[in-house]
Amino acid sequence: MNITPFPTLSPATIDAACKIARDQQIPLLISGGIGHSTTFLYSAIAQHPHYNTIRTTGRAEATILADIAHQFWHIPHEKIWIEDQSTNCGENARFSIALLNQAVERVHTAIVVQDPTMQRRTMATFRRMTGDNPDAPRWLSYPGFVPQLGNNADSVIFVNPLQGLWPVERYLSLLTGELPRLRDDSDGYGPRGRDFIVHVDFPAEVIHAWQTLKHDAVLIEAMESRSLR
């Protein structure tokens, strides 16, 4: 069994993946090169109270996370598999599958750990890549944690805050950007669109919530701010 974390991760997601790998003593496959969100990871690591000693600038995401896994979670080097060339979700899946296929022993089950905002799309991408292949691993989904938002007197906050979470504005930006990609229409990533992922069903209440967020003036302003570009 393998744990496979991917880019766009918050430190809280990294911790979730490393904890499983350490506790279960199973291999940890880390996927991620240098992409459009890498600077967000650099910033998150620099601000982390423990991980800020890790060198980041100019390095692939997977190599940074591998350092965290080894230095802070004491996962042996031989248990860490690094894929450091991918720059997007599709390449994460394709290159990781290729690496798993090189394993001496067949991998029957893999736990996919991703930032919760991208977990659904990542799973749909893996299932699209392997299709009906009977030799493909069984993909298990584990986002590590599920953020919940609430209102206080001043702003929107995380109800269940964890160390290393994205700022709320960054989280909402990622979340609202995922919904159009997950849709199975001409503009989405499903079979009727760009065919990057398997079909994903949308409950009516999710579509309604997305429409509400998409047209919220405060959120639009936040998403257009420099911090979310």
Predicted regions and their residues:
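Extended hydrophobic packing segments that form well-structured cores
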Residues: P203-R229
